[in-house]
Amino acid sequence: MTTVQTSVYEPLTEPKAVALAVRLGLFRDGTPLACREIGDGNLNLVFHIVDQETKQGVIIKQALPYAKVVGESWPLTLKRAVIESNALRTFASYVPQYVPKVYYSDESLAITVMEDLSRLQIARKGLIEGKTYPLLSQHIGEFVAKTAFYTSDFGMNQQEKKKLAQSFVNPELCKITEDLVFTDPFFDHETNNFEDELRPDVEALWRDDRLHLEAAKLKRKFLTEADVLLHGDLHTGSIFVSADETKVIDPEFAFYGPIGFDLGQFFANLLLNALSRSELERQPLFDHIDRTWDVFASVFSNLWRTESVETYAATPGLLEDVLRHAFIDAVGFAGCEVIRRTIGLAHVADLDGIEHKDERLVAKRHALRLGRRLIIERRVFTGTEDFRRLFAETEQ
């Protein structure tokens, strides 16, 4: 990968994106190129440039200095583009099969040029359409296990880990998560967004001191536990997938945090899809949760036993303690994400796309009950089968 620092920042347009691709030598001179801006997120411009003869393409992603969902009144650091390209490169050193190739990045322009993944589909969209993606959970379990282990104090020299962690200090993007996932939904905050019919349910959460105490504990973990290099935003909209291939994208929220956070985000987004499904249709989603954890625990444990650099690694009970805390935290983090995606800023199409309003409100009330109990009762979970139990208990 090439990283450079060139001109002063300016947002790209489609013609400028094409000119950049040609200047970088990614296409031959005179090649007929098609370009379109395909970004559907809140923070970036994304250009898809394709050779109209060979159909080969590249993606040019540029960070915006503000959140599109809010506008220029919400400024954002452009450093997140560097965080993203560095995270993709770091992840590629451990799991190259699960991330796009990075061809070029420019710090000043906040640009990353990467592999075209248009042969794949965004997992959220496919899951909403009813696709099941049999290998998705196996791949994500391995992705999280290997990136977590190899960037932890167990998998790398502790001093080298501290140096790596310094390069992923990401306060601006972490602040978004601190606010939108762990704080705002639990209080009457202007960023919250929900239907008027949900107000009694939401106000009950705002008055729930028991819930607030447990959410505060989870927020503290997010703020203070620098265990592993996290993707930081591992939802189903950050994953490209097919029947046999998985690619994790958009790690601009990457930072050193608690080992269970990425797992919790992924679990939550599977649950959000399950909330929009019939009982029979939910089963593959619960199976994905089971498989993700099983693969994560198996791969992480094998690496621990064969490659750990920690002197205490052979101490009986330590691995089990690490995995137990990771699982409990993942359950709680999942609860925060379920609530946030239901009543906070930046909803998900899994719920908002439910066509009939009455059914949508039923699903969202279910989401709030489920999220609350995931947070409060996380310590009583003994395995992923408890997701099924709690899901059924909170369905009314």
From Swiss-Prot:
Residues annotated to bind substrate: D233, R340
UniProt pathway: Amino-acid biosynthesis; L-methionine biosynthesis via salvage pathway; S-methyl-5-thio-alpha-D-ribose 1-phosphate from S-methyl-5'-thioadenosine (hydrolase route): step 2/2
Domain of life: Bacteria
GO molecular function annotation: ATP binding; S-methyl-5-thioribose kinase activity
Catalysed reactions listed for this entry: 5-(methylsulfanyl)-D-ribose + ATP = 5-(methylsulfanyl)-alpha-D-ribose 1-phosphate + ADP + H(+)
Pfam family, one: APH
Binding partners and assembly: Homodimer.
Protein name listed in UniProt: Methylthioribose kinase
GO annotation, biological process: L-methionine salvage from methylthioadenosine
Family: Belongs to the methylthioribose kinase family.
